Amino acid sequence: LRVVVQPCNKRVFMDAQYENAGATLSDDLTQCSVILGVKQVREDDLLPDRTYVFFSHVIKGQPENMSLLDTICKKNVRLIDYECITENGKRGDPRLIAFGIFAGNAGMINILRGLGERMLALGYSNPFLNVPSSYMHPSLNAARFSVRDAGEEISKGGIPQDFSPLTVVFTGNGNVSKGAQDIFSLLPHEMVSVEDLPHLPENQSKIYGCVVEAEDMLERLDSSKPFSTR
């Protein structure tokens, strides 16, 4: 089995490691019959009559990707979508491949860093400036220490008053949300309900968190029937 890997300097594994494992490094995939990726492929880059494996984001009928689905059909591409790989091979069964806890970890770390830079741009010094971006940390444990340090600064000196009460809202309780909540929990915080949001007191020494579920964002046209996501 010949394996071709496209060169990239953004992966956790170096190109040389793939070569040492027996892979061939090349940007040319025309000799490959099966092509694996993660995110959706640009339409112009799809090679005809191949099998592609990636997250296409079309299974729910996402309108922004219907053009991609049309191109897949026109180019006679066999699409294997990670999202459709389930425990028993049936739609609705538990998925076997999905973005996980680490995606939420990395995203929350980057959000804190971005929040710090935004506050600074508005003229406010703040504890989040001491949280480097995810890629700058040598390990997840190192990132946790950075977030804890920022949390200690919040406990002692608080966040800028103009941003209080600072609230982080998590949509849903999937893997990514749980990963984000995991990092958030390292800060001095209080979890509140959706009903509490309009009445939160100003408190500079902690951050509020709220998990928002589908029933908090949607309502049935017929209010006499109980809410259901199905």
Roles of regions detected by a PLM:
Residues 13, 30, 63, 67, ...:
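Conserved active-site and cofactor/substrate-binding residues in soluble primary-metabolism enzymes
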Residues 15, 34-37, 90-93, 218-222:
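Short, solvent-exposed polar/charged micro-motifs at secondary-structure junctions
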Residues 18-23, 75-77, 203-207:
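A short helix-to-beta-strand connector/capping loop
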Residues 23, 34, 74-78, 112-121, ...:
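Generic secondary-structure signature for well-ordered alpha-helical cores
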Residues 25, 52, 79-81, 206-211:
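Conserved beta-strand scaffold positions in the cores of enzyme catalytic domains, especially
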Residues 43, 47-166:
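Glycine/serine-rich phosphate-binding loop and adjoining beta1-alpha1 elements at the start
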